[in-house]
């Protein structure tokens, strides 16, 4: 299902979309933008922005439930462990195998789209996470919105 071209595309996106600054207000603005994008999506989504281990923004659209919260927890763990998108973790696992114990732990980690790393001034600082759509659509909505916000700050 996945290939090296997708892995390269994800790596380039992660290496490009890095913030010079990102604070509490940015978390609110980005989270609100993700929620607004989710309101236009065909299914409801949940949104979370984490910075320095703190959840600075979290919102659940009507129709989401505890399952979405559970998926966001898994995606957050995956992004925090890898410093990459949760989709990249899925692609690498499929292409190269589950070599590390965490790569076989689907109870605690997510191997699907919906988690994006937040790098600030060159350092990994947190994640933007959504849940609710089919995972590739989660990834697309998330990446498009994060990239748009990043471009607005340049």
Give the location of each predicted region.
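Structured interaction and signal-relay segments at domain junctions
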Residues: 39-104
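Sensory/regulatory domains in signal-transduction proteins
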Residues: 97-135, 140
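General "foldedness" signal
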Residues: 48, 61-63, 69, 130-132, ...
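Extended aliphatic helical segments
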Residues: 17, 29, 47-50, 79, ...
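Juxtadomain coupling helices with adjacent low-complexity linkers
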Residues: 1-33, 37-39, 125, 131-154
């Amino acid at each position: 299902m996945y290939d090296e071209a997708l892995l390269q595309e994800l790596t380039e996106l992660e290496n490009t979309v890095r913030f010079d600054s990102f604070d509490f207000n940015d978390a609110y603005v980005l989270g609100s933008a993700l929620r607004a994008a989710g309101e236009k999506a065909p299914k409801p989504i949940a949104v979370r922005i984490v910075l320095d281990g703190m959840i600075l923004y979290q919102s659940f659209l009507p129709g989401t439930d505890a399952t979405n919260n559970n998926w966001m927890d898994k995606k957050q763990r995956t992004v925090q462990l890898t410093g990459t998108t949760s989709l990249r973790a899925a692609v690498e696992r499929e292409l190269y195998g589950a070599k590390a114990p965490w790569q076989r732990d689907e109870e605690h980690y997510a191997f699907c789209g919906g988690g994006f790393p937040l790098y600030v001034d060159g350092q990994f600082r947190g994640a933007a996470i959504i849940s609710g759509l089919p995972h590739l659509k989660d990834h697309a909505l998330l990446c498009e919105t994060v990239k748009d916000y990043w471009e607005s700050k340049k």
